[in-house]
């Protein structure tokens, strides 16, 4: 299946930066940041409130979701799992699940062309099968907001229009794409919370909290008349995430005890020994770098969608008294959306426009930019 950190370890390009896009205008209203005013009596917005040592948090999975069970398979019909992209390749993740007259599509991503595909900017999946069975398609269920999982939606929806179900941040990123293609009026977006179950035709689908290099990532428990399929989406096990809760391993265990027909699991870099470090560990690295280069301008390239990493850069810059400027169209779009939804907390007077950088000495500025993989059209390039 798909990648971790938007294809970072595979060496593939990052589709989030786009190709041939115009440099963003921070003076435009869509590219301005407005930090929320700090309430009286509260700590700085970048700091989490102190935990009560006597408080014992309740596990999420104690409140088990109510699942409307699909009807039993009494006629010998089979569940079809149809990969339309994303297997044995990086990117273009899309899988159809079909039972009788119901089809549910999980993810709808794009990929970059091979070296011999001259003149091609993006590659989208072949959805001929969905077009031929369009009356069966009940909806698109999206695991998270990376381009290789949502990037093809504006193109596929023009051929196969169905409601889209996902979590809050993922839907917001999808909505931004649909606006660019004038599809917002013709596409239904349905927000789903972790732990919630939706019913689509012969399927019931449960969203399970996971961690990834983008917030609001989900795994799916797909209940069908013939059994349960677990689709992990892209994930990592992070017990100390920067934002939100850790992966809900307890819920995976509960579903496993019920009996699972199949598991479709992210396997990117599974052949490598070791494990993926917590995102908080990267925050400690920033502290060391800012201490080491106190008199220099700091430029940090990262994936636009890695909101947790951007948050830690902003937190570190604030502690060291530096202003933060952002460059790169996708970076601006994601930061704006994440800040509006409350996934990114930005102190007042911290962000500046890119053309204001020249007004500050080097030791007072940090630049966050796209282009961490050397993409030809990214801001860093």
Residue spans for each PLM region:
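Short beta-strand segments
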Residues: 368-369
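Intrinsically disordered, low-complexity RNA-associated tracts
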Residues: 1-75
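His/Asp/Glu-rich metal-coordinating catalytic cores
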Residues: 54-141, 146-360, 372-381
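Short, surface-exposed beta-edge/turn micro-motifs
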Residues: 363-365
